[in-house]
Design a protein with these regions (language model features):
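Alpha-helical scaffold/interaction cores of sigma-54-like transcription cofactors
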Residues: 1-9, 14, 19-495
Length: 495
């Protein structure tokens, strides 16, 4: 206990007096008895119910889940009413075959259908759902299935952002397909905030004993730990500790480690040298678990009973919660994201009061953007109501959906630098080209690379495959600086 208290390395003299060789042998004996034959995630079986077969043409031809997925796609495609033989018809059908082939080969068919099953239930019960967001918006098949309402072909969104052949992994063992859960595609399902519990209850009833929520562990950040240690260990005033903790910077949205801050920020170092008890205590406590919570949207879905793959806790409502965090739990189980959003509820209620269907709204109607110009208080307008986004909106003066989307993208910390450049483009048609090679890609955003899809297009333009471009996108998105430096060399070689 003294070793733990003093944060020291245990000395050989203080180790157990038991024979080390005997303990090693005992450990190896026990280790051999453990069943560590973990292959990955086995998807829960998707059952094609009679009700589902009534939705499609020629149900007698359905032999498996892949056939059923194709039939659902055909039904959705017919609604587009495209002229057969046209360029548009070919472009769309090519995309369907491309996506279907990848989903089948990677073993994702049943996962797609499981998500469709949840959305179908919501629609049958008149539970409002979102229009789709995130990487799932890049899948045209999800659009055909009604899981999203975003035509990824029309809006030039990449399927590789959703599913990458390089990133995804599967293996066959004794005729059973196992997937790498940490590398699976991810679909966010936004539902009415007030009716989310109905969706969770449906999942629990459909997959009895095979679902649970996911535990989250909140740790002590550098800012918090130095602030609290100063107040408790050396009785420092709140005002002083707010000033000191404010010296700890954020790098790419993450609080810098206090040890690194000590080495790089002179004022912080001077204060810590004068208050060594606070600093030494903070060093020991940083990164420790502060409290635990529950993930706001993630639900685990297991092939077997959930207790077979995860230790389970019960909360005050007797709901099951995985004691593993999300990274560990997804090694063995499918993760579904069902998020209750008040905005989905508000939009649905407003449309019902007015007597319109949200899908019938003309998103290019001039009155929408005129209202944005006249706004004095943006409260209640999703994302635009944030102070930064509202200021960007007033400067850019968006005239259509494309420009409004750019406003929200410009509101992020890394993109704020380019607000004036983009505003010059939208207001005065001033375009600042980066390189002739990328003009076609960046023209719509005034020479500013606002979207991750643009990064992928640029990488593809100089010779990388779209799957390779997706790897680059993830590295940049997750701010892996060392990996980015490696990619610089690859890019130079291509150029």
């Amino acid at each position: 206990m003294e070793t733990v208290k003093e944060n020291k390395k245990q000395s050989p003299q203080r180790k157990s007096a038991a024979d080390p060789q005997r303990k090693k042998s005992s450990f190896e004996d026990q280790f051999e008895k453990l069943d560590l034959n973990i292959h990955g995630v086995r998807l829960p079986e998707f059952t094609i119910e009679k009700e589902y077969l009534s939705l499609i043409d020629n149900p007698e031809k359905i032999k498996n889940t892949y056939d059923f997925l194709i039939a659902l796609c055909q039904k959705g495609f017919k609604k587009l009413d495209l002229k057969k033989g046209s360029k548009k018809h070919k472009k769309y059908t090519d995309r369907i075959y491309y996506e279907l082939d990848i989903l089948k080969n990677l073993g994702f068919v049943d996962y797609i259908l499981l998500v469709w099953k949840v959305i179908y239930f919501c629609k049958q019960k008149d539970i409002p759902v979102g229009l789709g967001r995130g990487s799932a918006a890049g899948s045209f098949i999800l659009f055909l299935l009604g899981v999203t309402k975003i035509d990824s072909v029309k809006h030039d969104l990449f399927f590789e952002r959703f599913v990458s052949k390089i990133r995804a992994k599967k293996k066959e063992v004794d005729g059973i397909t196992y997937l790498d859960g940490s590398l699976m595609c991810d679909i966010d399902m936004d539902v009415c905030y007030y009716r989310r519990k109905e969706v969770l209850k449906y999942l629990e009833e459909e997959f009895s004993g095979k679902t649970s929520k996911i535990r989250t562990l909140n740790t002590l950040s550098g800012k918090l730990v130095i602030k609290e240690c100063g107040k408790i260990v050396e009785d420092k005033p709140e005002v002083e500790m707010n000033r000191i903790s404010g010296m700890i910077p954020k790098v790419f949205g993450q609080v810098k480690d206090i040890k690194e801050t000590y080495e790089e920020v002179d004022d912080f170092k001077d204060w810590c040298d004068k208050n060594p008890k606070t600093f030494k205590t903070a060093l020991k406590l940083r990164g420790l678990v502060k409290n635990k919570g529950v993930h706001p949207s993630a639900i685990l879905l297991s092939y077997d009973q959930i207790v077979e793959s995860c230790p389970i806790e019960l909360d005050s409502d007797k709901d099951k919660i995985s004691a593993y965090n999300m990274d560990w739990a997804s090694i063995f189980n499918v993760k579904l994201d069902v998020l209750g959003l008040r905005t989905v509820s508000v939009v649905d209620q407003a449309c019902k009061l007015i007597g319109i269907d949200v899908e019938d709204i003309d998103l290019e109607h001039k009155s929408i953007y005129q209202n944005l110009y006249d706004l004095k208080r943006p409260q209640g307008i999703f994302q635009v109501e944030a102070d930064t986004n509202f200021r960007v909106c007033q400067k850019v003066k968006p005239k259509n959906l494309e420009e409004l989307s750019a406003v929200l993208a410009l509101g992020r910390p890394g993109a704020l630098t380019f607000v004036d450049q983009y505003a010059s483009y939208t207001n005065d048609d001033v375009y600042e080209p980066i390189h002739p090679l990328f003009d076609e890609i960046l023209k719509s955003t005034g020479g500013v690379a606002l979207y991750q899809e643009q990064l992928m297009q640029m990488a593809h333009k100089i010779g990388f495959t779209l799957d390779e471009a997706e790897v680059l996108r993830r590295i940049v998105g997750k701010k892996k600086i060392k990996e980015v430096k490696k990619w610089k060399k690859k890019i130079r070689e291509k150029v």
